[in-house]
């Protein structure tokens, strides 16, 4: 169990997390969530620790009960142009900007914060320590996983539905044999190699 997180003094807190920094294909997806203290959601945890069935149930519950939630993203072209870190920060800014309720404080999973118009704090292992960040991690993961299933339907040979774009042995093998799709991140070394650019 990770240490207890001490919340900042604020009345409206948003949690932010990202999914998809490591994959070779697709967008990096972020979510920002403001929970409603009068409508608690039981069982929020880091999305990676939950079964897919539980994640999907919580995703629906968060959509229904949260005061506000928003998704952000940075596309492969932006990742290639900016680099993955800066693209992730941009996607986080987009998620926060999309909230229908403006938070007075933002808690972000990880060790750095994007520039935001309100105070923010980075929380290491926040997805398992802060309910708002756990909720954001679930929203982002379910969204990105669904996008990978859709991409799998367009490009069935690559196995995107299984590995979600991460550089598994199978994915690397298919990348070498078939080349890159238009959705692959060209700045990532295995994709560069497949395109003969490395």
Swiss-Prot record:
Cofactor(s) recorded in Swiss-Prot or TrEMBL: Mn(2+); Mg(2+)
Report whether Signal shows up as a keyword of the record: no
InterPro entries registered for this protein in UniProt: RNase_HII, RNase_HII/HIII, RNase_HII/HIII_dom, RNaseH-like_sf, RNaseH_sf
Entry binding sites for a divalent metal cation: 17-18, 109
Pfam families on file: RNase_HII (PF01351)
Which major enzyme category is it?
hydrolase
Major location category of this protein: cytoplasm
Alphabetical keyword list: Cytoplasm, Endonuclease, Hydrolase, Manganese, Metal-binding, Nuclease
Q: Which family does it belong to?
A: Belongs to the RNase HII family.
Recorded protein name is: Ribonuclease HII
Name the gene for this chain.
rnhB
């Amino acid at each position: 169990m990770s240490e207890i997180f001490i919340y900042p003094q604020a009345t409206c807190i948003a949690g932010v997390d990202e999914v998809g920094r490591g994959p070779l294909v697709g967008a990096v997806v972020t979510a920002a969530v403001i929970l409603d203290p009068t409508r608690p959601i039981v069982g929020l945890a880091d999305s990676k620790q939950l079964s897919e069935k539980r994640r999907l149930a919580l995703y629906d519950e968060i959509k229904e009960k949260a005061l506000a939630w928003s998704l952000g993203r940075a596309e492969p072209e932006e990742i290639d142009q900016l680099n993955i870190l800066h693209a992730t920060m941009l996607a986080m800014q987009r998620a926060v900007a999309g909230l229908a309720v403006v938070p007075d404080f933002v808690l972000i999973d990880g060790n750095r914060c994007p520039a935001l118009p309100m105070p923010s704090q980075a929380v290491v292992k926040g997805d398992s320590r802060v309910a708002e960040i756990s909720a954001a991690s679930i929203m982002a993961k379910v969204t990105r996983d669904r996008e990978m299933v859709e991409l799998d339907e367009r490009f069935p040979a690559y196995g995107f539905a299984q590995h979600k774009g991460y550089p598994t042995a199978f994915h690397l093998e298919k990348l070498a044999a078939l080349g890159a799709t238009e959705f692959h991140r060209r700045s990532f070394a295995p994709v560069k190699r497949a395109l003969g650019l490395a």
